[in-house]
Each structure stands twice: as C-alpha cells, then as structure tokens.
Design a protein with these regions (language model features):
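Extended Gly/Ser/Thr-rich low-complexity repeat segments
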Residues: 208-211, 216, 273-298
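Primarily extracytoplasmic ectodomains and periplasmic/lumenal surface modules that are beta-strand-rich
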Residues: 109-112, 205, 269-273
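Detector for C-terminal structural segments
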Residues: 1-161, 226, 259-260, 264-266, ...
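Short, solvent-exposed loop/turn and secondary-structure capping segments
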Residues: 72-73, 114-118, 208-210, 229-232, ...
Length: 388
C-alpha cells in the first residue's frame, strides 16, 4: 500500500472494509474522487473509525501546543490550528518602539534538520525558519482553513464531478524518455482547469539578486515528473517517487498564455473551488531553478548526495542540506561545472515553442548562486521578506 501497510478485512460502522481498502479510501480523498460533501464526509467517518480500530498501526493524535510571548508583542496572527506557525505571524508581528522581534526555538539544528526542497524541510526547526524565508503561492486562511492566494492568484474552471473539459492541443506534458515537453495526446480531457497568475513573483528578485521568471516554476514541474517516472531516478529516490506519483497521475497538461499565466489541467474536483486551486498549484517558486538543477546533477548524475534520508542511508552519501557548508560546497562545485559547460536544462529550452532561459541567463544564475555561497557559506536562497 501507499503507507507500506495493508489493513485486514474490517467491520466498521456496520459495513465491511476489505483488505487494503483503507489505503484506497485515503487516496480517494487525496485525489478528490467523491461526488458531494456528504460522500466525502462519509469517507472521513469510515476512515476515522477504521483508523481507531487499527490504531496499533494507524496513528491518530490531537496535539496541544503552547507558545509563550511577551505582552509587548503585537500583531501576531494566530492560526486556529497551527497557532503562530503560519506565514503571516512574523511578517506582521512587532514590538512598539523596536525594530526587532526576537524569537527563540528549542534547537537551531538537529540530525533531522535538512534544508532541501525535495526531500528535506521536514522538521519544525527547519520549517519554522523556512516559512519566513519563502513566500508560498497559496496558503490556508488562518481562521477558516480554506486555501487562498498568498503571492499567486488563480481562477478555477471545472466540469466536475460528472463531466470533463477538453485540454487544448497546444498544452504540453513532460516526457521522461525524450526529456522534452511534448503536446498532450489528441482528445485529452480533464475535470478542472486552474489558471495561475504569478505577476507578484515575476520581475521581483530572488535573494541572490536574479529576477524570478517562469523558468523557476516550469523547471519544478519537470523535476517532479522526472522524480516520479524516470526509472533510474525512481530506483535512487524510491520513497519520493512512490509518494508523489498518485497526485501526478491526475495532472493532464500545462499551457502558458500570452500574458504569462500558467494553465494547469487536472482530474480533480472539490465542492470548494479553492481546494481545486490548491491541488493544482505546482511547486515552483521556493528556490531558483539553477539550485534545483545543480542538486539534480549532484544526486542523479554524480551520485555524491541524496534528496531523501532513505536514499542517503542506502547509498552512503550525504542527505543534502543547503544550510551546511559541506553540502553547499558540493552544490557549488556542480554549479561551477554547469556554468563551464554552458548548461541550459532541457525543460527550459522549449516549453510549447517558448524558450524560458537563454545561455546568458543561465550563466548569470550560476554566477549569482556561487557569489551567494562565497559570501554566506550556505545556499539557502529564496524570495521571502527575510533571508538566512
């Protein structure tokens, strides 16, 4: 199963849950394969009851956290679930008459604190900092939990749950065999279309001074497909491939409009259209594309590091963390190699007839990242209001 666990046959709420069906129900929710709010709630009830019945293996927990703060701290947004662990908290908090807000944490770093956007950023000591270094495209409203625009806006068009939309013939998808964007097959359909407007990113700068472009979003989309479907990469980063493939299977195509908006076509429906927008949102603007390209080269071609802890352990290489000078130095060497070879990733050379990065732009990116490393001795680069 998805969680490397398969439940036995269960009797839950007067109905039989077949062997392995708990896994199927979870993916049904994950992919939005329900026709109404009522059906979705029934699935939740069934899964909760089954989870309690199987609680030796399926962990259910209610967590209470406390976050002490001085009375002088003002403007702190408190999420109904996560408390101050939200992107607005430290962006808006202040102490009257002071230009500083001092925040303490139990640890700055542990053995599990790993700064890489593919298989890291998994513990609070990294995430609590990262949340203030990087602007997300969307985020759940602190008071309702409903997804909303943060630095990207979107429009949703859906034919679900019972009908489909035609995917335009000039939409593309990534082909892992040819390493190129190819037109979607004739007659391709999707349940929903989401149009993303990245105007608040484009033209602004990454922390190292280079302008944010659509190349950063597009590289991430291709990278995700490579990790999930390229046989050699799947062999190396198996855990990432297995967990990402179920959602990627529902993405049917991508298309750039003349005004630089990105259309995403997905087989996904939800009774709240904001959830469709959140589901379809591609990861793209967390780190600049040249860092991801260098890490891909380091992990899959040079085999001198790994994205995940499981791959790092299996192949006896570092679990790459860009905050550590040792690991950042490995990436810096690879950046130097990419610059020397004048590399422009295939994913950026031709996207539906558009070139998203020229050799000159790529060279400037490699140089800026290396200069950042020379100055900061790490490669944690993003685009939020604070930098590391």
């Amino acid at each position: 199963g998805y969680w490397q666990y398969e439940n036995p046959e269960l009797q839950v709420l007067g109905q039989t849950i077949g062997a392995g069906e708990l896994d199927d129900l979870g993916q049904t929710l994950y992919r939005g394969e329900f026709d109404s709010l009522e059906q979705r709630n029934d699935i939740y009830r069934t899964m909760t009851a089954a989870g309690l019945d199987e609680s030796v293996r399926v962990w259910l927990a209610t967590v209470d956290n406390s976050f002490p703060a001085l009375d002088s701290l003002t403007g702190l947004t408190r999420d109904l679930v996560a408390g101050p662990r939200n992107p607005w908290a430290l962006r808006e908090a202040y102490v009257e008459g002071s230009g500083d807000v001092r925040v303490g944490h139990q640890w700055v770093w542990t053995e599990r604190t790993t700064y890489n956007p593919v298989g890291g950023l998994g513990d609070v000591y990294a995430v609590d900092l990262w949340r203030n270094l990087s602007d997300p495209t969307l985020w759940n409203d602190a008071f309702t939990g409903i997804p909303q625009p943060f630095r990207a806006s979107y429009e949703v068009e859906t034919a679900g749950p019972e009908d489909t939309l035609e995917v335009p013939a000039d939409a593309v998808t990534w082909d892992v065999e040819s390493k190129a964007w190819v037109p979607v097959p004739a007659g391709t359909t999707a349940v929903s279309k989401v149009i993303f407007d990245y105007s608040d990113y484009l033209g602004a700068n990454w922390h190292h001074g280079q302008p944010i472009t659509l190349a950063d979003a597009v590289y991430s989309i291709a990278q995700g497909m490579e990790l999930a479907y390229d046989p050699e990469k799947v062999r190396i980063e198996t855990a990432i491939a297995v967990t990402s493939r179920p959602i990627l299977e529902t993405f049917k195509g991508y298309r750039l409009t003349e005004d630089d908006r990105l259309e995403v076509y997905v087989d996904y429906w939800h009774f709240d259209e904001d959830h469709i927008g959140a589901y379809a949102s591609p990861v793209g603007f967390d780190m600049p594309w040249e860092l991801k390209a260098a890490m891909d080269e380091l992990v899959f071609e040079e085999r001198r590091a790994a994205y995940s802890d499981t791959a790092a352990s299996r192949f006896s290489v570092p679990w790459i963390s860009l905050v550590l000078e040792r690991d950042a130095n490995l990436v810096d060497r690879t950046l130097r190699k990419l610059a020397r070879e004048e590399t422009v990733p295939a994913a950026l050379a031709d996207f539906g007839g558009r070139t998203l990065a020229t050799p000159e732009e790529a060279a400037a990116r490699y140089e800026a990242a290396r200069e950042w490393f020379d100055e900061k001795e790490h490669l944690v680069i993003s685009q939020g209001p604070f930098y590391l």
